[in-house]
Amino acid sequence: MFHLSSNISIGKLEQVKPANVKWETSVENYVDTCTIDLPRIKYLVTDKLSTEDKSELNSRKEYIVKEGDAVDVLLGYDGRNERRFKGFVRRVVQGIPVRVECEGYAYLLYDVIFNKSYSSTTAKQIVTDLCQDLDIVISNEIPTIPLENVRFKNATGIQVLEWLKNECKLAVYFNFNELYVGTLFGKSQKTVKLRLGWNTIKDNNFKQRELDKNVKINIVEKNVKGEVKRTPADVQKYSNEKDVKVKAGIPSELLKQIANRLQTKSNYGGHQGDIELFLEPFFNKGFVANVDGFRYPEKSGNYFVEAVKGSFGKGGGRQTIQLTFLQQL
């Protein structure tokens, strides 16, 4: 029989014993989240008199856990703990139990004000300048993505990431304290095997996607002279077209990758959805799930882990992985 185990630190507190933990992380979102429920009395300090009710809050009672405290959450079975979340305390909610709301390393960028202009630069240089003096590691796997005529004025760190995601159509996400910017499938990935009905709990939501019509994706960029350039995805049969605007100056080979990624996502007709598991085998976003369909061989194949959410508490440990197509570059 497996026994739940954990190794959680919050600020200066080590081996924190939670009532419940929930976490969520996705390649579509650069803000990882985690909530930790703690026993109320154990994590309060007070100077109440011995005749007062120590379970009641007053102005002389406060929580040991503070906003901005570093948080590290490792969970598993029988001491085989894997890191599920790393970040900072965003807010402490009073109640029974105490709820500690946490965010990943994007938390450090809320108060950053960024003013910088570039005539010619790269996406990696922008995030390197943005994160200087912060405890954020810039991924070595960020591809060279040239950008021209970029200007930020009084932009927050979060707004800079949002610009890279929305204007340049790049994947922007953290792997704990490491920031990655690039194509969705450009980062090295670990492959983990799954067998439906064997080391999974539920796969009812892992279904074949229904398509109404095929759409051809065109990446559209306009330079400073007003000249428009279209980069189409590699698709033969389609019933409609969709233009997606991007920042001018991105290399043509990268534009083709972006177009093909959006094209595959739009017209993908294979299986996708959620699979619920125990805490083992361990998954993180960006992994590849090698699925053995067992009784459903049509579900077999390699899938990209787009998101992971999980829970840990008296009811046991669970993780739900969200699977989608895996584009071969």
Locate each region found by the language model:
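Polar, S/T/G-rich
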Residues: 121-128, 132-133, 156-166, 220-222
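An acidic/polar, Gly/Ser/Thr-rich interaction patch typically located in mid-to-C-terminal regions
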Residues: 21-64, 201-329
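N-terminal export/assembly leaders
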Residues: 109-114, 127-152
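Soluble periplasmic/extracytoplasmic beta-strand elements of cell-envelope proteins
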Residues: 35-37, 72-74, 86-90, 99-103, ...
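Assembly/oligomerization scaffold segments
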Residues: 1-107
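Short beta-strand-centered interaction patches in the first periplasmic/extracellular domains
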Residues: 97-106, 140-211
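Short, compositionally biased
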Residues: 87-96, 150, 185-188, 302-314
